[in-house]
Amino acid sequence: MKLIIGLGNPEARYSNTRHNIGFEAVEALAAAFGAPFSKGKGKYLVAKIRHRGEQLMLVKPMTYMNLSGHAVVAAMNFHKALRSDILVICDDMNLPSGTLRLRSKGSAGGQNGLKHIIESLGSEEFARLRIGIGLEEKPQGGYSSFVLGKFSTDERNVMNRTLEVCTEAILDFAVNGISHAMNHYNKPVS
């Protein structure tokens, strides 16, 4: 069993924002399998899919991004998941738009959702998939206005293709492990 956690903010006003690309990733995978989200045993929504004999629990924390660790711990406890079973998906403004970066462990790198998960788990030892949202220069309104901003039409086109590849990367992780997925998907989406 794998726990695939897409990070985002739960309110409708955050829909289609750069910061919610993690939600979009798990939503795209759930849609591809026709799996609906329902309330989990904690502050999260969950959809269940099966791929090549592997069960995947797709999780959307219903806490704000900066408190994602609470939902992750609740989901891990309920589903009896180990850190090696989880993949956390989030935005990364330091990666070019449309670039995927899988890692088996590491720091938060300035991503507050990851930071809270690391604090809550007491460890950086879990896989993550960062999706580049392409900050090219310091935004006038500050970093939070950038990540909480909506995608432009051009950005949305790039993200739609990126989400297709992201779905493949998640399934590869679930079946073949993080090292295999890293070797195949750590590159810009073309």
From Swiss-Prot:
Main subcellular localisation: cytoplasm
Enzyme Commission code(s) on record: 3.1.1.29
Coiled coil, from the record: none
Keyword Cytoplasm set for record: yes
Domain of life: Bacteria
CDD domains in the record: PTH
Active site: H19 (proton acceptor)
Molecular-function GO terms, alphabetical: peptidyl-tRNA hydrolase activity; tRNA binding
Reaction catalyzed: an N-acyl-L-alpha-aminoacyl-tRNA + H2O = an N-acyl-L-amino acid + a tRNA + H(+)
PANTHER family named among the record's database cross-references: PEPTIDYL-TRNA HYDROLASE
Protein name: Peptidyl-tRNA hydrolase
Natural source organism: Chlorobium phaeovibrioides (strain DSM 265 / 1930)
